[in-house]
Amino acid sequence: EILTREGHSVVLVEKNKKLASVATREFHEWVHTGSLYTLVKDQMKTLKYILGSLDDLLEFYSSFKNMNLSPSEKGLQIDQNKNGWFNKNYIDFKYRLKNRKFLLNWVYSVSRSIALIEGIRKHDWLRRRAGIIESVTSEYYLPILKNFFKILFTNEKFLKIESTDFTTNSRLLLRDLLSTSIKNGLEVLTENELVKVENKGNEVIAHCKKGDLIGKKLAICVGGGVEKFTSIKIKKSLAPIAVVKNVPPETKSFVELDYFKKTCINIITKGSSYGMIGGISLSERKDAEKYFDYMIEEHKKSNPKLEVLEKYIGVKNEIISRGENRNYIFHINKEENKNIWSIIPGKFTLAFSIAPEFYRIIYNKNPRKFFDTNHEENQESLVDETVWGEVQNKLG
């Protein structure tokens, strides 16, 4: 979309019958605001990337009428409406404390996480970009200390807070982007797999199953399939997920967080008694069934009527550096071939930074911030439904 808004001629090649039919179809539609990554030990790198992406969302996507997120002096505001990109479905964080207080590093991590989330909640988005947030500064010392002693003296199994994370209507968002792109001249070619890429003079040739395409520049956005066309090595993580029903209407979306990651679970509510449950990522497929059993059993302890409609394993593709187990950020890599780039998107929320950053890399300037948009319902046929939406539609 960001290329077409600038008047460039763009062709989108998709090997499947519909767009967005893999990762964004499978996962929770969880919009990260940095809350979850207050627990990640990476010098706040992921947290800053996430917050920077929200800055870019506000700066480069506010022309879309259904982009219903706005800045305020104290946090981000969501204007709830039926066609809005985002929902006031805020996600509760439940930090496990029972039998964990002897793990003082966990107690500190929780104390720090809660203080940072409160900082995100109170951030003045009107006057300061959030992506420039510094590491833990003196203003956080006292809140962290207070949280630390509060945790030590509580008898609760979990310490619960409402995070700043919320959910998205990903299909509405993607259809708006696609509709505007098509209005600006985008050509979409589905069921047409990329086979090989090469340079010829100043041109790039994309050899596809339905014929060759010739252009000036090429972005390869094929997830784990990028290994076929580049020297990049991808680490795949497996996420057991289930679509469930009989979720009481008063149930809030939540994630249970623990020092021992294997016990983490979550649920994202989808309305009309539907929800999605999951929690962790695995390295080995053989471990998935054991975790399915565990997370379903844990959810049924509080909701015995919970019914599992479908189980599946989502795949996450990441570029991992030495010493890392996970890497959540996006990567834009210049290939040896002239005018060819490969892109690994990272978290869905980071899409709003990938696009403007890619444009800056290619054209050495920022994309425009104000432009005409388009909303056409008939783009529904080009964008695949989510797994949970498909299950819901089948059941009526």
Task: Set out the residue ranges of the language-model regions.
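Short amphipathic C-terminal alpha-helix that caps PH/PH-like domains
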Residues: 106-120, 291-302, 355-362
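C-terminal catalytic lobe of FAD-dependent flavoproteins
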Residues: 305-396
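Active-site substrate-recognition segment that forms the wall
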Residues: 1-2, 29-31, 67, 217-339, ...
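Dinucleotide-binding Rossmann-like beta1-alpha1 core, especially the glycine-rich loop
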Residues: 29-147
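Helical element adjacent to the flavin cofactor pocket in flavoenzyme catalytic cores
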Residues: 157-217, 221-222, 352-361
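Helix-loop-beta segment of a Rossmann-like dinucleotide-binding subdomain
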Residues: 71-97, 139-184, 280-282, 337-345
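Glycine-rich FAD pyrophosphate-binding loop
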Residues: 4-26
